[in-house]
Amino acid sequence: MALFLSKRLLRFTVIAGAVIVLLLTLNSNSRTQQYIPSSISAAFDFTSGSISPEQQVISEENDAKKLEQSALNSEASEDSEAMDEESKALKAAAEKADAPIDTKTTMDYITPSFANKAGKPKACYVTLVRNKELKGLLSSIKYVENKINKKFPYPWVFLNDEPFTEEFKEAVTKAVSSEVKFGILPKEHWSYPEWINQTKAAEIRADAATKYIYGGSESYRHMCRYQSGFFWRHELLEEYDWYWRVEPDIKLYCDINYDVFKWMQENEKVYGFTVSIHEYEVTIPTLWQTSMDFIKKNPEYLDENNLMSFLSNDNGKTYNLCHFWSNFEIANLNLWRSPAYREYFDTLDHQGGFFYERWGDAPVHSIAAALFLPKDKIHYFSDIGYHHPPYDNCPLDKEVYNSNNCECDQGNDFTFQGYSCGKEYYDAQGLVKPKNWKKFRE
């Protein structure tokens, strides 16, 4: 900018000087013509190569004009160069603004994590827990440690909306054989966004308190919103591609003799679950329509090989309430980090259903995974014996059951029971059901 101004000043000086010289010359020539005697004037032949005073004046005027025009041309040239640079910048900005929407699919944001097949997955266990849940958490840790983590250790991240007590941290650190990390949730991730009418939300909770489970709970709604849209943004998870969600009071019934994270990575799976179930419709009256409206506005996010048939029996017109139970998730964090999911969550969040209804993170995660991913990227861990009150996932395959020293009752397996969505999942994926699956429907 300084150089540009200096050049302008130089051009102005040159032009001003030329004008002054011209005026002085004209004045001088005028006086000269007045005082030249006619005899001297007649003695010179101005047509034989010499220049008359009048012609000299004209010549000097022309020279001054040329000098001025040259300076102006130079200024225009540099102005043009400056304009060109500005135009280029504006053009680039315009092109960027008019550019088509990013055509990357959700999988394009996930596949880079598959490239690490030769190395250990960037993975961790993650638990959102309160200090008062220490006893239940230690029970869960014991199962995870004995069934898998001692054989295939990974870091464990513990998150809380309040500071962990020293007692809590000491007990957990002692119980976990691998690295542990403790994190606090940012306040804005566990509070009301500015667009939520808190008076209205409180009235809805009061009315729902006796109508359905957690209907009157404020903290449960914050938890569902956090698990839906924020846990994967926590700074302690930034270095990881994979996570296994573990909650207090869960059980693992069988030995897990392989690295599940490595299996997910090598087989290019994105979302894994153990239990599928129907949601309480009264808690999510507008979730499906809101989701379908989002898909209509953003059809590019709907994967062509999606798992819509798991969610809907009429190609999306209505929701059959099926979802993956999110208290157990082994999944790729980049699914939630993708533009599709970020925009989807933002749409849901502004709709207000986490507070005005009681939208759970399980149906939110399930709808997104089933629609944004190719269906072959979703995996049912039928070999992992798992319990979260009150349901069990118990391997029905006898060989798997025996070889993994399973301790569960196969008769209690929830997969094909009436309230489960195991049948819907098997049908949607084209999987062959166990021979005795129908007995669980009785």
UniProtKB/Swiss-Prot annotation:
Task: Report whether Membrane shows up as a keyword of the record.
Answer: yes
Where does the record place the region Disordered?
Answer: 68-95
Which SUPFAM superfamilies does this entry report, sorted A to Z? Nucleotide-diphospho-sugar transferases (SSF53448)
Q: Which pathway is it part of?
A: Protein modification; protein glycosylation
Q: Where is this region: Catalytic?
A: 119-442
Bias class Basic and acidic residues marks the residues at 85-95
Residue positions the entry lists as glycosylated: 197
Which Gene Ontology cellular component annotation is one that this UniProt entry carries? Golgi apparatus
Q: How does it sit in the membrane?
A: Single-pass type II membrane protein
Q: What else is known?
A: Present with 13000 molecules/cell in log phase SD medium.
* Physiological role: Mannosyltransferase that transfers an alpha-D-mannosyl residue from GDP-mannose into lipid-linked oligosaccharide, forming an alpha-(1->2)-D-mannosyl-D-mannose linkage. Required for the attachment of the third mannose residue of O-linked saccharides.
Q: What name has this protein been given in UniProt?
A: Glycolipid 2-alpha-mannosyltransferase
